[in-house]
Structure formats: structure tokens, C-alpha cells
Amino acid sequence: PMKAARAFLESAPGAARFHVTLFGSLAWTGKGHGTDSAILLGLAGQEPETIDPDAIDEILAEARATGIIDIDFNYDRELERHTNGMRFAAFDENGDAVAEEDWYSLGGGFIARGDEPEPASRAGEPRIAFTTSESLLEAAADNNLSIAELVMRNETAWLSEAEVDAGLDRIWSAMQSCIDRGLRTDGILPGSLSVSRRAPKLRRALSKKGEQSAIDAMEWVNAWAIAVNEENAAGGRVV
């Protein structure tokens, strides 16, 4: 939804007001999944890959304070193409419509506008196809490759090895940043249950220990996992 909102923003330069309607399952899960916040961020010009997680609360507060973005939840209707549908409308200062588009969240970070075809997830076919873990092991053995080598060979069917490495570096950096932020951010998670963050307390307790045992190592892994879960619940950037 953030990507869809950001893309719609390009279709409505200079708009004075926005109205967004979420349909079907996207409406039902919207608030629980932070969809309304994601749309506000997108219409504020933000993108998932580049937004600073530490700035999200401030950006949202500013977007809400403007009062120019209305979001409705239509629980009873689905758009024809997909259950995760959104309708964006933009208006000028006189209240006249200047743009309207339907967008769909297709999963996996992919979006589509109106009747446009779904974006291809790959630009080519894998060099060594497999569909199950068993066929993956067989393909690796048949080609005398490790699993990592086989996957790299497939990835380089549509990207250069340098592009694959750069993409992995970005993903790893995002994962590390997510863990780090989750471990250092105290407070209450969003939602009506008022759940306190646990990961920072676990980090402090484990850091006070001297010699680390195998059990402590497992506790660190648990702390990292909880940190990521809490960042996800708080609307942070996760992989």
C-alpha cells in the first residue's frame, strides 16, 4: 500500500486533498496491519526501501495534522480484480477531482494499477529449475554444485553477479538495522493491548553476563527474533 500510494502521488502533482478507500480483506486487516499508516507515508512521498524508521512517527504526525488525507474502509465490497484493492482519488483546492486510480496489493511487494498486467517477478527463466527440496538436492548433485552455487546460477539468469551481491548486501543491511533498532527501542507497541517491548530488556540482561554459555547464545537468537517481531508490529522496516 505504501508503494501504491507513492505511485499514485506521481499521477496527482499539486493535489490539495486525497481520499483513499480500502476494499475487502484489505479493509478488514487494514488497521491491524498498519495499512492506513503505510498509505499516509506513501502520500507523504516515502518509500519502504528508503524511509528512515526513526522518522516514521514524526512523518505520520505531520501527515495527520494536515487533515488533507481521508481513508475509508469498505468492508462489504471487493474490487473485481483482487481482494486487496485500493481506490485513490485526488482533488484540487476547489474540490474538483484531478485523478482517480485503483491499485492492488498482490503480495510479495508487488502492486498493479487498474487493468495493467501483473508485474513479472522475474525477467527470465531459471537455468536450473526445481520445485521441491528433494528436486533441489537432486539438481545440485546432478550439476555438481552446492545449493548456494545453484541458486547463484539461477539468480544470474536475470541479474549480474555484482547486482545479486549488491541486493544481498541491501537485504542483510536491512535485517541488521531491524535487529539493532528492535534491541535499542523501548516503549509500548502500537495497538490497544499496550504490549511492552521485550527485546531491549533481554539485550540488557544478556549484556550484563560475563562468560556466555551455549544457552546464552540461544537466548541472543531469541532476543534477535523478538526484536524483529516487535519492529514488524511497530511498522518498522523488515525483510
Residue spans of the language-model regions?
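Alpha-helical support elements that line or immediately flank enzyme active sites
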Residues: P1-S11, V239
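Short Gly/charged-rich anion-binding patches and loops
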Residues: K3, G34, W220
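Short, functional N-terminal and low-complexity linear motifs
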Residues: L9-E10, L26-W28, A140-N143, L189-V195, ...
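Generic structural signal for hydrophobic core residues of well-folded globular domains
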Residues: A12, L43-Q46, G182, N229
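Catalytic-core signal marking the mid-to-C-terminal active-site face
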Residues: G14-L22, L26-L159, A166-I171
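Accessory "access/gating" subregions that flank catalytic or transport cores
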Residues: A162-V239
